[in-house]
């Protein structure tokens, strides 16, 4: 999961929790069913949108109006959840309902209702299957732990370890 679909962006738009408050969402609601212009449906736990995270109806990405490839005119962003339950592009409407009332696209195929992202990482340097001389190899990549954050990263072998928060001269264990 992830691969080249993981990235960083600064999103701008309207807080989804504010929209739900203005709409007077029923406290019994469990699921937001968002629909996209291409017919795709997504089920998002209402609790995830109302728990304080910055869930958005995004209209901007990195200070620019959304491009069509990123979901113009509006897309849903719910940090900490995998996209199949939180990232509808080209949003046309959102229904507030229960889980029993509707099975969105991936739920119909047996996927989970809730899909929190867990701590994980990806190594981008060196590229997969590239060849290197014996000895020290520089690693580069990303680590993420939604909602908790990442304080440091430790990469090592059986003989040495280096952490991202340790000066190089002190990093070999």
Spell out what each predicted region is.
Residues 159, 171-172:
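Residues flanking N-terminal targeting/processing segments that define the start of mature chains
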Residues 155, 165-170:
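Short amphipathic, helix-prone segments within low-complexity/disordered or flexible regions
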Residues 138, 159-166:
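Ala/Thr-enriched low-complexity intrinsically disordered regions
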Residues 1-153, 173:
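Structured, non-membrane catalytic/scaffold regions adjacent to prosthetic-group chemistry
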């Amino acid at each position: 999961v992830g691969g080249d679909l993981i990235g960083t962006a600064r999103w701008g738009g309207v807080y989804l929790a504010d929209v739900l408050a203005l709409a007077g969402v029923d406290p019994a609601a469990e699921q937001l069913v968002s629909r996209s212009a291409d017919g795709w449906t997504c089920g998002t736990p209402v609790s995830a949108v109302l728990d304080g995270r910055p869930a958005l109806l995004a209209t901007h990405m990195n200070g620019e109006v959304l491009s069509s490839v990123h979901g113009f005119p509006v897309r849903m962003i719910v940090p900490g959840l995998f996209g199949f339950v939180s990232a509808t592009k080209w949003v046309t409407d959102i229904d507030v309902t229960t889980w029993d009332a509707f099975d969105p696209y991936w739920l119909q195929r047996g996927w989970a209702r809730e899909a929190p992202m867990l701590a994980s990482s990806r190594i981008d340097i060196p590229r997969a299957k590239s060849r290197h001389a014996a000895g020290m190899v520089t690693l580069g990549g990303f680590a993420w732990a939604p909602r908790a954050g990442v304080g440091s990263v430790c990469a090592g072998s059986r003989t040495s370890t280096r952490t991202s928060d340790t000066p190089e001269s002190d990093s070999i264990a």
